[in-house]
């Protein structure tokens, strides 16, 4: 079983489709991914994926590829949050947030976590930002316990695809006990 930080660096270096920029962010990446993978594989939590509207394409990409039959692994519990609650753009009050959380607690007795990809100030970010165990890829704001990116980065779309590729490889390696993501 390889140590997670070293495995991450080796994977970035060996995969010609992942650029070196991600290696420079390894100390941000590793603890966030470790927490996310542990939530799924160790704690049995489901992942509710949310993006801002500019990243709807990425949401479709993630959900199409995460459980692809080509992966030769068990399907993992990743869901489009909009399939549970369509009016996320309209959530404004604490009561609405609590009603949604109550529904999710009933629906997911083992627990759930959010994976949010998008602008920090977007209405869709409210629920994930204030929920524990969220996996956050946040744009245009430096937030602790989030992977921070810039919305005006010309390479942003490519970076998202590379990050997903590394995350997906991490899920497989963890699932097949090639690495241990826990510290």
Q: Which residues make up each language-model segment?
A:
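Conserved N-terminal alpha-helical segment that immediately precedes and caps sugar-phosphate-binding
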Residues: 1-183
């Amino acid at each position: 079983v390889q140590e997670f930080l070293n495995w991450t660096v080796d994977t970035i270096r060996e995969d010609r489709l992942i650029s070196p920029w991600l290696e420079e962010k390894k100390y941000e990446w590793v603890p966030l991914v470790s927490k996310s993978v542990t939530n799924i594989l160790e704690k049995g939590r489901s992942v509710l994926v949310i993006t801002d509207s500019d990243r709807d394409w990425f949401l479709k990409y993630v959900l199409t590829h995460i459980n692809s039959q080509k992966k030769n692994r068990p399907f993992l519990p990743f869901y489009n949050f909009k399939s549970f609650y369509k009016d996320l753009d309209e959530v404004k009050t604490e009561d609405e947030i609590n009603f949604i959380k109550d529904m999710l607690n009933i629906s997911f007795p083992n627990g759930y976590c959010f994976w949010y990809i998008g602008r920090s100030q977007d209405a869709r970010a409210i629920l994930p930002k204030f929920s524990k165990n969220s996996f956050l890829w946040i744009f245009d704001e430096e937030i602790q316990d989030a992977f921070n990116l810039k919305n005006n980065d010309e390479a942003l779309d490519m970076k998202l695809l590379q990050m997903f590729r590394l995350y997906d490889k991490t899920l497989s390696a963890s699932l097949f006990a090639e690495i241990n993501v826990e510290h």
